[in-house]
A protein has these predicted regions:
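Residue-level marker for buried hydrophobic side chains located in beta-strands
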Residues: 10, 184-185
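Helix C-cap/helix->beta junction micro-motif
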Residues: 8, 119, 179-180
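Conserved core of the PLP fold type I
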Residues: 39-175, 192-204
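A conserved amphipathic alpha-helix that caps or lines the catalytic cleft of carbohydrate-
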Residues: 2-5, 177, 203
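Metal-dependent active-site segment of extracytoplasmic phospho-/sulfohydrolases and closely related
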Residues: 181-183, 194
Length: 204
């Protein structure tokens, strides 16, 4: 439809969330050091050094006790893999005779919907609107939905709006999850994109 359109200014591509800048030189050098090892399979759960580094980073970033690399961490090929597999593994079918519900913010990352469908759950979309500061108000859902909820998925900072959940919002989600017995999947893949104040995370 836009094939014959000639924009007056440089266009910005918002279609896919991928880096638009070249790979930094120091990253290229670091990868080059290990190029001879790229023909091997890595450890399934991640190397000990990697998991220890992640544990240390989480402790410093969120000011928490260091998570156990053996019990609390697993290396993933991006958040998509983790969200999808965790949904399949942890979607609870024991809450009643009806299909379990997975709550999904709208707009949403396509992986959320794919995971819900693969788990044979009912996806329920909860709007992120200007009126709720682009953070879905899950508490307004009817009890009949919340009682069937197995997993709530939330993205903060959100995409595409950039809304950031504060401590009060996280606490309200935790209270709701405890009341209705569901799990929270917190997708914080944009947590390190900010100007001045670090976004608060669920681990805090």
């Amino acid at each position: 439809l836009l094939g014959k359109v000639n924009p007056l200014e440089e266009t910005l591509d918002f279609s896919v969330g991928e880096p638009k800048h070249p790979v930094p030189p120091f990253v290229k050098k670091e990868i080059a050091k290990y190029v001879d090892q790229l023909n091997r399979y890595p450890p399934n759960f991640g190397s000990e050094k990697l998991l220890e580094s992640i544990s240390s980073w989480l402790a410093n970033r969120y000011e928490i006790n260091s998570p156990s690399p053996d019990k609390n961490l697993v290396a993933l090929n991006g958040s998509r893999e983790g969200i999808f597999n965790a949904t399949i593994a942890l979607c609870n079918y024991k809450k009643g005779s009806e299909k379990p519900v997975i709550l999904i913010p709208n707009p949403f990352y396509q992986c959320y919907l794919a995971a819900a469908l693969a788990a044979d759950a009912e996806p329920v979309f909860v709007p992120a609107l200007p009126s709720n500061h682009f953070l879905p108000d899950f508490s307004k859902l009817p009890p009949k939905i919340l009682n069937r909820t197995s997993i709530l998925i939330i993205c903060s900072p959100s995409n595409p709006q950039g809304a950031v959940a504060d401590l009060n919002y996280w606490q309200s989600l935790l209270n709701l999850a405890e009341l209705y017995g569901f799990k929270i999947f917190s997708d914080e893949c944009y947590s390190e994109i900010y100007r001045d104040v670090k976004p608060v995370g669920l681990l805090q």
